[in-house]
């Protein structure tokens, strides 16, 4: 015996999510799915200001611990720290990686960040994600992306487009796109909102990032100081689901809100590449159709960020109502669908939004997202034909399902990893 008492607890997902955010745990089996196609998204979540930093690096008592060293002089930077805090070393390292335009140096510094994380002993990678789901053979036009988001707007059910019933998860924690930090919430938000860019499939079925509310996704202009400026023109006639005009200023408000220290969003750091982050973002609406944003430096995955929920627009007068995103009657969005029903812990109903700029290419008229985390219940409804997609199956049924449903049992690639994490502020030794 080592004299340690261990209490094991299996929590419902949203409870587990908030327990980890609050640091109210000692050890947890965790997972992370990429937010865009670049390794930095597995590293920047551990900076001290990140809301996704469940290990609590640089938070609480750990904020003042001086135990870390950093030397970036081999990469042409005037940074050398001995016995510094997490913020003085790891946070500085991540910032340097994000501003680095030399690919070799950038990857070398990412290896340093990985080594720093592993040396703490607080993160133990287990295995990589695969996205397992069941999709009925009658469904056509469905696609998912490497981040795990599911898309139904192009679907038909053996040619019928009236409605589709699916189950991707239980009750979402939050559907405010600035505050969401879960894959199921991102799937819902990606149907309800439209950013400057979106994930789509080409004619040959390949995934791609394409313009959504923006007319196009132009190249940035490199300024003399190394910053990069992008100018986006919105499509004509953009509207919110309640019929009001959508303006460039709505994007500016949404981005500044999402990045602000006042909101304290988990994904606020996703705007770190924008000049003036966090409280003075260099983004402006020069007129109702034009958005100008300046980045600190070139960012290879910038277009992917524009398709990420944190970059979706919200309207200032709508979000002034604190409970706006918890009820269909107050939920205002600008995407392919509008919310027309939310029976909490039962079902969320999305109906085609005729105000969406590309509504003529939205095939499915209604999507019912049934809410459950009971995998046996999910499988029963799939077998009965009631739910045409379920995003999880009972582990003990996998071998059987592979055999009995060879075309409907899907194992898709996903950019993510499972790991065990320790709360760095917990003293676990007796």
Outline where the language-model segments fall:
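Ligand-site clamp/hinge motif
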Residues: 5-7, 12, 355-400
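Detector for C-terminal structural segments
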Residues: 17-172, 183-191, 343
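Alpha-helical secondary-structure segments
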Residues: 101-119, 165, 247-254, 288-294, ...
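A bilobed periplasmic-binding-protein/Venus flytrap-type ligand-binding module shared by bacterial periplasmic
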Residues: 129-130, 199-200, 235, 351-355, ...
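N-terminal lobe/hinge region of extracytoplasmic solute-binding protein
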Residues: 167-222, 332
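Gly/Pro-rich hinge or "lid" segments in bacterial periplasmic/extracellular proteins
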Residues: 183, 187-190, 194, 198-204, ...
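Aromatic- and charge-enriched surface segment that lines or borders ligand/interaction sites
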Residues: 215-265, 292, 381
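Surface-exposed binding/hinge segments that line
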Residues: 231-233, 267-317
């Amino acid at each position: 015996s080592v004299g340690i008492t261990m209490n094991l607890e299996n929590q419902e997902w949203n409870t587990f999510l908030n327990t980890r955010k609050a640091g109210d745990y000692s050890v947890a089996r965790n997972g992370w799915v990429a937010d865009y196609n670049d390794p930095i998204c597995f590293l920047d979540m551990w900076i001290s200001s990140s809301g996704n930093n469940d290990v609590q690096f640089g938070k609480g008592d750990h904020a003042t611990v001086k135990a870390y060293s950093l030397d970036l002089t081999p990469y042409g930077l005037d940074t050398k720290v001995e016995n510094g805090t997490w913020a003085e070393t790891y946070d500085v390292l991540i910032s340097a990686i994000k501003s680095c335009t030399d690919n070799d140096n950038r990857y070398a510094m990412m290896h340093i960040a990985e080594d720093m994380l592993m040396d703490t002993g607080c993160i133990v990678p287990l295995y990589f994600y695969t996205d397992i789901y069941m999709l009925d053979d009658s469904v056509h036009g469905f696609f998912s992306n490497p981040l795990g988001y599911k898309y139904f707007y192009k679907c038909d059910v053996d040619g019928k487009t009236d409605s589709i019933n699916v189950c991707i998860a239980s009750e979402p924690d939050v559907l405010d796109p600035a505050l969401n930090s879960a894959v199921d919430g991102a799937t819902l938000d990606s149907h309800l909102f439209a950013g400057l860019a979106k994930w789509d499939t080409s004619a040959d079925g390949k995934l791609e990032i394409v313009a959504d509310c923006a007319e196009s996704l132009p190249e940035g202009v490199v300024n003399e100081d190394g910053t990069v400026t992008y100018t986006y023109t919105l499509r004509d006639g953009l509207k919110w689901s309640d019929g009001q005009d959508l303006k460039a200023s709505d994007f500016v408000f949404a981005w500044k809100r999402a990045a602000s220290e006042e909101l304290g969003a988990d994904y606020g750091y996703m705007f770190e590449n924008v000049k003036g982050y966090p409280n003075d973002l260099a983004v402006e609406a020069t007129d109702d159709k034009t958005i100008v944003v300046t980045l600190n430096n070139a960012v290879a995955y910038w277009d992917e960020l524009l398709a990420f929920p944190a970059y979706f627009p919200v309207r200032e007068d709508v979000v002034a109502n604190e409970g706006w995103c918890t009820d269909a009657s107050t939920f205002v969005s600008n995407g392919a669908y509008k919310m027309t029903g939310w029976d909490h812990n039962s079902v969320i109903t999305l109906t085609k939004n005729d105000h969406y700029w590309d509504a003529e290419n939205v095939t499915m008229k209604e999507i019912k997202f049934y809410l459950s985390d009971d995998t046996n219940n999910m499988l029963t409804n799939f077998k009965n034909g009631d739910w045409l997609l379920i995003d999880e199956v009972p582990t003990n049924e996998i071998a059987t399902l592979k055999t009995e449903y060879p075309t409907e049992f899907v194992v898709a690639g996903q950019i993510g990893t499972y790991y065990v994490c320790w709360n760095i502020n917990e003293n676990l030794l007796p």
